[in-house]
């Protein structure tokens, strides 16, 4: 078969960085972040979190090619901050949201188990 090995979808090549940033010299306070071995899931999550930030003028993402699992996120900020700070802030916020979601899930599973144990 011509299909690539499945591990190639998520294992980074030796020496490759997961995230790289390139400043846009044509637009003030703009940068492009490339995230390797990711897809629309992470691209849209980060974009939506960035859009909620008051300092963001533009945030968008694209996948350069359907068979390449890389996401390009382009960001432009106002003069109050820079794109790197905004991405770091959005990633911290997403991390807190996922931790909260995990804790809520575990709590609900425990409640369900406790109710089920009463009837056994």
Curated annotation (Swiss-Prot):
UniProt keyword Transcription present: yes
Family matches, as InterPro entries: RBP11, RBP11-like, RBP11-like_dimer, Rpo11-like
A GO molecular function held by the record: DNA-directed RNA polymerase activity
CDD domains from the UniProt entry: RNAP_II_RPB11
Subunit structure, as described in the record: Component of the RNA polymerase II (Pol II) complex consisting of 12 subunits.
Similarity-based family: Belongs to the archaeal Rpo11/eukaryotic RPB11/RPC19 RNA polymerase subunit family.
Name this protein carries in UniProt: DNA-directed RNA polymerase II subunit rpb11
């Amino acid at each position: 078969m011509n299909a690539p090995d499945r591990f190639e979808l998520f294992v980074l090549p030796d020496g490759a960085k997961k995230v790289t940033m390139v400043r846009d010299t044509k637009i003030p306070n703009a940068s492009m972040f490339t995230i390797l071995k990711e897809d629309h899931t992470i691209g849209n999550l980060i974009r939506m979190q960035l859009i909620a930030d008051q300092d963001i003028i533009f945030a968008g993402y694209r996948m350069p090619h359907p068979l390449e699992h890389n996401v390009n996120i382009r960001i432009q900020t106002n003069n109050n901050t820079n794109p790197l700070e905004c991405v770091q802030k959005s990633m911290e916020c997403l991390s807190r949201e996922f931790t909260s979601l995990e804790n809520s899930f575990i709590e609900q599973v425990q409640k369900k188990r406790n109710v089920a144990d009463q009837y056994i």
